[in-house]
């Protein structure tokens, strides 16, 4: 039990540091080296609208992979993202994206309900879904993250994407 508390504490501190860094550095992303460009993709958001890699243009993006029935790190990841969302709410140059790794369970309706339950009331935070093979491909080949054994084996990293669609940092 103590190990679990330490993991949660570490995650909270990490996300706090990450939030501070985003606030101070998001607009000056030229200091952070480009890791790679986000490849082309087209998924569907919680409102049934298409969302593609082109939606990363002109906005700094924080992206993560979650699933709504997760009882492990996802609720904490979502809570931390919610805090960032609250800090940047209404800032047109910043957006948040959560991609489900369990699209069979996380239907469009379920993602919409999740967004409403955590207080998302605009298009600044997108919850995306596609078929599992496409999610795995994007996760593994596009974001260079572990994509086997989904949904339970998903990465807990958040990804910083600059306003031209380049991956800049993993947290």
Regions found by a protein language model. Name each.
Residues 38-39, 61, 155-157:
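Short loop/turn microsegments at loop-to-beta-strand junctions
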Residues 93-106, 123-135:
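Thiol-based oxidoreductase modules, predominantly thioredoxin-like and allied folds used
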Residues 111, 154-171:
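A short, hydrophobic beta-strand/beta-hairpin element that forms part of a small beta-sheet core
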Residues 112-156:
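Short, internal strand/loop/helix patches
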Residues 51-81, 97:
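Short active-site neighborhood of thiol/selenol oxidoreductases, capturing the structured segment around
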């Amino acid at each position: 039990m103590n190990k679990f508390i330490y993991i949660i504490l570490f995650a909270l501190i990490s996300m706090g540091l990450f939030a501070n860094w985003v606030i101070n550095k998001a607009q000056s992303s030229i200091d952070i080296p480009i890791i790679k460009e986000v490849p082309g993709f087209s998924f569907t958001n919680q409102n049934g609208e298409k969302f593609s890699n082109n939606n990363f243009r002109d906005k700094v993006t924080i992206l993560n992979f979650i699933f709504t029935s997760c009882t492990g790190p996802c609720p904490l990841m979502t809570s931390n993202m919610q805090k960032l969302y609250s800090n940047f709410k209404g800032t047109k140059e910043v957006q948040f994206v959560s991609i489900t790794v369990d699209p069979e369970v996380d239907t469009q309706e379920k993602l919409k309900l999740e967004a409403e339950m955590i207080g998302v009331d605009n298009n600044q935070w997108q919850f995306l879904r596609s078929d599992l093979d496409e999610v795995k491909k994007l996760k593994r080949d596009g974001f260079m993250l572990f994509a086997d054994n989904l949904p339970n084996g998903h990465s807990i990293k958040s990804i910083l994407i600059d306003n031209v669609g380049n991956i800049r940092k993993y947290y």
